[in-house]
Amino acid sequence: NSAGAAAPGTGPVAAGGDGDDSLYPIAVLIDELRNEDVQLRLNSIKKLSTIALALGVERTRTELLPFLTDTIYDEDEVLLALAEQLGNFTGLVGGPDFAHCLLPPLESLATVEETVVRDKAVESLRQISQEHTPVALEAHFVPLVKRLASGDWFTSRTSACGLFSVCYPRASNAVKAEIRQHFRSLCSDDTPMVRRAAASKLGEFAKVLELDSVKSEIVPLFTNLASDEQDSVRLLAVEACVSIAQLLSQDDLEALVMPTLRQAAEDKSWRVRYMVADKFSELQRAVGPKITLNDLIPAFQNLLKDCEAEVRAAAAHKVKELCENLPIEGRETIIMNQILPCIKELVSDTNQHVKSALASVIMGLSTILGKENTIEHLLPLFLAQLKDECPEVRLNIISNLDCVNEVIGIRQLSQSLLPAIVELAEDAKWRVRLAIIEYMPLLAGQLGVEFFDEKLNSLCMAWLVDHVYAIREAATNNLMKLVQKFGTEWAQNTIVPKVLVMANDPNYLHRMTTLFCINVLSEACGQEITTKQMLPIVLKMAGDQVANVRFNVAKSLQKIGPILDTDALQEEVKPVLQKLGQDEDMDVKYFAQEAISVLALA
């Protein structure tokens, strides 16, 4: 599989004559590096450190690495494993003094066609760069970066972009100037892929440069990349803007960066505007309060009104964070006058993703705006969203109720909440039903026991007989959480009787649900209720004509057994399990015998 270096010889490794085969596997691993079967080569590469340990540092350097360097035309999977292994190889070639021996194979890997392999090779090179001394870095690592940066293939030039920032800080001034020059030329490379790679590393590179170089070199590069003909390059420049903005003073920001950022927020490509919206909170923190008020707020208003739904949704997601990060003084006025009018429009947006994004954060504004504003301005919006035709919107409002509960109490909403909860609870999509069930214990806690018993209890019982198993299962767990919230006395009076009635249901699935409920309720309700109210029902169901029910009786007895006292176990449970242990159905027998042994009733 290789036309280059010979594989490391196996002779000296497997020394020790016929009797000693302890080193034999190494010989096999080395042979497998050349095997026709990809899987065997892959296994061998994954055990590369074992081979290197056996060969010792010198032979790893002189035989194994040249062999690996020459075999780099293999399946991508094998190359990926190799690139990963070599990143942790410094100790196996003799430590930092010899780290440069690992560069040739990784340099080859950094130029292959498959992106995943190149990225892994770059990651390993970045790791190894830290282990070079400054002298070795300039002698071995920097030349590698320069070779990649001026390579004929775009693959090598894209890989170079990820290596500048790790070798720059420790290089001499003359070499630093060369590194900056190479980075500059890659930012204006003819191939869009290379410019993309350079743009994606611009922020990272800016962080390791001297401030003067940031102003004189990075900012012009940022400006050019932000007006590149390819929108995929421009949107990466927006990401870099966050890092660059953190490095500059307010005056420099205003003069050097803001014109470009303003332009990006109005870019003709929606993907660039989307990126501005998506990075809005980071940009806001990076540019500070003054520029936020003068520049970012107007830009944000436009993004919330953007003609592209994706952009509006991304901006809507950021509403709460934007408001939280505004300086407290004057915050309320800005939100009420500049942000809230846009939000009101979004509540009735034509796109459900936009409405859903807004619904997931809008409740958080109540803590920022306080009680009176919430009641007067936000409450009508919440109520409108609770009536929205899209279930996701209603669900997002309901699942964020806790924010509002802290500010105005949930009573204000309870009359409108109820129809919304009922509709979601009966939604045709079972995942929507599932989501509302999972939120029920929190809702119950916020609305209180009277409201719950009057309005929501029947829903919780209805879910127990849903036609989707996942819903029945979630509804069962929901009961347990409710008992933990409202206490055992409530359970005994309200829940347990309703659950036990289902034991006589003609549908065997519903009879089984009774057992599942007892499994989770017994622990929450304790010994007395379990023994007096639940156990008799379980024992009676042992005579059910459906085998599925009978074996679930055995499982239930195993589950509630530890809660019961010894008398009940010996006198009531044991005879029933023994009878089930003789059942004609194999499964019933199996689970009954398992229960007998787990409960030590044999």
From Swiss-Prot:
Domain of life assignment: Eukaryota
GO MF, one annotated term: protein phosphatase regulator activity
Any one GO CC term of the record: protein phosphatase type 2A complex
Record InterPro entries: ARM-like (IPR011989), ARM-type_fold (IPR016024), HEAT (IPR000357), HEAT_type_2 (IPR021133), PP2A/SF3B1-like_HEAT (IPR054573), PP2A_Regulatory_Subunit_A (IPR051023)
Database matches in SUPFAM superfamilies: ARM repeat
Keyword annotations of the record: Repeat
Pfam families reported in the protein's UniProt record: HEAT, HEAT_2, PPP2R1A-like_HEAT
Record-level GO BP terms: meiotic sister chromatid cohesion, centromeric; spindle assembly
Record text on subunit structure and interactions: PP2A exists in several trimeric forms, all of which consist of a core composed of a catalytic subunit associated with a 65 kDa regulatory subunit (PR65) (subunit A). The core complex associates with a third, variable subunit (subunit B), which confers distinct properties to the holoenzyme. Interacts with IPO9. Interacts with SGO1. Interacts with RAF1.
Reported function: The PR65 subunit of protein phosphatase 2A serves as a scaffolding molecule to coordinate the assembly of the catalytic subunit and a variable regulatory B subunit.
Similarity comment text for this entry: Belongs to the phosphatase 2A regulatory subunit A family.
Protein name (record): Serine/threonine-protein phosphatase 2A 65 kDa regulatory subunit A beta isoform
Taxonomic source organism: Sus scrofa
Gene: PPP2R1B
